[in-house]
Amino acid sequence: MSRFLEDLRSLSSAEEFFSFLGVEFNPKVVQVNRLHILKKYQTYLKACDAEENGESVSRETHKRCLERAYADFLTSDARSEKLFKVFQSEAGKAFVGLDAILPLAAAERSESKVNSSAEA
């Protein structure tokens, strides 16, 4: 593994990625969208990796991908980008299975029996 990739793997915050790759950024934009920017960066990197036939993606490619991901959030927002599952589901279309409801109903019945016994 190259020194560049080792250093890259040691980064833990979005700000560290921006500094390490030499990408200028507005801290307010990154603070609000950090996870979304990094997720989009990862998406762009995967596309570049496929184009480069699995060869190690260069530092310049990493920088371009991060710049592109950051630029997306200068003109868009997390809800519009829909990178995470919570933003991908349609509003009002949440699914709650019976296996989640039945234990709650049973617990409520047991609790009401205990309460009515205590009152008597």
From Swiss-Prot:
UniProt entry keywords in alphabetical sequence: Nitrogen fixation
InterPro entries registered for this protein in UniProt: NifW (IPR004893)
GO biological process, one term: nitrogen fixation
Reported function: May protect the nitrogenase Fe-Mo protein from oxidative damage.
Record family assignment: Belongs to the NifW family.
Subunit and interaction comment: Homotrimer; associates with NifD.
Protein name from the UniProt record: Nitrogenase-stabilizing/protective protein NifW
Organism: Rhodospirillum rubrum (strain ATCC 11170 / ATH 1.1.1 / DSM 467 / LMG 4362 / NCIMB 8255 / S1)
Biological classification of the source: Bacteria, Pseudomonadati, Pseudomonadota, Alphaproteobacteria, Rhodospirillales
